[in-house]
A protein has these predicted regions:
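Binuclear metal-dependent hydrolase catalytic cores
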Residues: 1-173, 181-185
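A conserved mid-protein helix/loop that constitutes part of the nucleotide-sugar donor-binding site
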Residues: 178
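A short alpha/beta connector and helix-capping loop motif
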Residues: 181-198
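Short, small-residue-enriched loops and turns at beta-alpha junctions
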Residues: 201-203
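Charged helix-capping and loop-helix junction motifs
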Residues: 206-213
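Conserved small/polar residues in nucleotide/adenosyl-binding loops
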Residues: 219-224
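N-terminal low-complexity segments that are often proline-rich with Ser/Thr-Pro
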Residues: 226-228
Length: 228
């Protein structure tokens, strides 16, 4: 089961101030968009990708009672600033929540959210860090219970981000403008692909709509190798 929790921009839709709804129709309820995040679930396992500033309301809305793992695509605020909201999952069963991400993002998280991962002399005596960092490489494969996850490398302008493929069927590629050559083969033959489509016109850090649409057509079709 795939549940899309949010598909909004970094400031959400509507945005504060004069940005407002932008070109979106405020009369269409689907245009009210929270920050990007997705749940992957089956009967035994619940995996969250990204935890932005809307994550508490997103998880409450979908009645999420446990998390087996959290995967973080990159260190931008709209993908990580809700990590503190995950503490109650630890309070319930006293098992640290595993946060999977790359080395660059891990380093950033330890700087910004050190108290969530490491106990310090200044911490309250009763406060135990509820999260545990798990470093993953690009193109690594692992299993969370009965769900298989493969990570791929994506370009997001001045930084690289993680994309994820679940059970060789579902690809989640947010905040990407281009893929390196060795990411392409991993994406073929998907049943479902969710990919950034920020604007109608090209953008330096996000794929625009036509590029995203063509990616979906390409990667949810058989690989050229399979078609001879």
């Amino acid at each position: 089961k795939i549940t899309v929790l949010g598909t909004g921009t970094s400031v959400g839709i509507p945005a504060l101030g004069k940005l407002g709804w932008g070109n979106c129709d405020p009369l269409n309820p689907k245009n009210r968009r929270q920050r990007c995040s997705v749940l992957i679930q089956n009967e035994n396992t619940t995996i969250l990708v990204d935890a932005g500033p809307d994550i508490k309301n997103q998880l409450i809305e979908h009645n999420v009672k446990k998390l087996d793992a959290v995967f973080i695509t990159h260190q931008h605020s709209d993908h990580i600033s809700g990590l503190d909201e995950l503490r109650p999952f630890y309070f319930y069963n006293r098992e640290k929540i595993k946060i999977y991400t790359n080395a660059e993002t891990s380093e950033f998280l330890l700087t910004r959210f050190n108290y969530l991962f490491e106990k310090s002399a200044s911490s309250q005596s009763y406060f135990n860090p509820p999260l545990e960092l798990k470093h993953i490489e690009y193109f690594e494969e692992l299993n969370i219970n009965d769900i298989n996850i493969k990570s791929i490398k994506q370009n997001h302008g001045v930084i690289d981000t993680l994309g994820f493929i679940f059970n060789d069927k579902f690809g989640y590629c947010t905040d990407v403008v281009d893929f390196p050559d060795n990411s392409f083969n991993s994406l073929y033959n998907l049943k479902v692909l969710i990919i950034t489509g920020l604007r109608e016109n090209p953008h330096s850090a996000h794929a625009h709509f036509d590029l995203s649409f063509n990616c979906c057509l390409l990667y949810t079709s058989p690989s050229p190798r399979d078609s001879g």
